[in-house]
Amino acid sequence: VVVITGASSGLGLAAAKALAETGKWHVVMACRDFLKASKAAKAAGMADGSYTVMHLDLASLDSVRQFVDAFRRAEMPLDVLVCNAAIYRPTARKPTFTAEGVEMSVGVNHLGHFLLARLLLEDLQKSDYPSRRLVIVGSITGNDNTLAGNVPPKANLGDLRGLAGGLTGASGSAMIDGDESFDGAKAYKDSKVCNMLTMQEFHRRYHEDTGITFSSLYPGCIATTGLFREHIPLFRTLFPPFQKFVTKGFVSEAESGKRLAQVVGEPSLTKSGVYWSWNKDSASFENQLSQEASDPEKARKVWELSEKLVGLA
């Protein structure tokens, strides 16, 4: 059994379909919009019985806890958890907030997943599947040792003062580095750096004792995905051909879904603490993370601040 957050569209749906089609995986589609996810699974041709749709709104920590309770009541084993759902609001100049009053990009992409993964770690440990995994979807945009990661505004967590202040925007900053002005594109990139730091911190704290594989991946640029739905129309028109012909980083949703499915089930990809990428021939390789995204001291601080913000400390 694999749980995939944000499986109602894009990469999450493509991976859910790829895994369900193997006949070996039952996919739990953990989605904010139950109806949309059910329709999407049917439209994708996923066979009845190969998936279960469950409600999860990562913008509410109560909803995360309710999902975990509901999943346990369903008495399914948990063999792999995929943290995939993401909010990207690149043109936003004002923050929006989660139910707890935390800036939305970091609240959903990082903190909601952080709580979910911490709670479900117990379930992963109970599974007798020999290759249990926790997979966090990263992004090249948060990795400043790549071309795409150097497109401004660059990810930068600074000294984490905004995160320490709870990212409320009211009493302090809604940006992790404490910047007074809000930038939606940077908030997304910062949240993905938090994802990558979290994966490594999970690896350091739990891999040796549990044998669980903790990994992250960048499945390639899915230029046609709905993740870009808030971008300016000109960008949406120009970006796919630019990716396809200029940077050659373009992959279809189906191909990216297969890549995520590989990281979920492929026996050769069991190494823990790794950030997987794919080359032009679609061969997987271990990618280097930027200095900030692989800073163990920063990872520890993000972990400890996140524990407080989700009520685990």
Curated annotation (Swiss-Prot):
GO cellular component terms attached to this protein's record: chloroplast
Top-level EC class: oxidoreductase
Compartments where located: Plastid, Chloroplast
InterPro entries in the cross-refs: NAD(P)-bd_dom_sf (IPR036291), Prochl_reduct (IPR005979), SDR_fam (IPR002347)
Keyword Chloroplast: yes
A Pfam entry, by short name: adh_short
GO biological processes: chlorophyll biosynthetic process; photosynthesis
GO molecular function, one term: protochlorophyllide reductase activity
This enzyme's EC code(s): 1.3.1.33
Gene3D superfamilies: NAD(P)-binding Rossmann-like Domain
Superkingdom, taxonomy of origin: Eukaryota
Keywords: Chlorophyll biosynthesis, Chloroplast, NADP, Oxidoreductase, Photosynthesis, Plastid
Pathway: Porphyrin-containing compound metabolism; chlorophyll biosynthesis
UniProt catalytic activity: chlorophyllide a + NADP(+) = protochlorophyllide a + NADPH + H(+)
This protein's record includes keyword Zinc: no
Family to which this protein belongs: Belongs to the short-chain dehydrogenases/reductases (SDR) family. POR subfamily.
Protein purpose: Phototransformation of protochlorophyllide (Pchlide) to chlorophyllide (Chlide).
This protein's name: Protochlorophyllide reductase
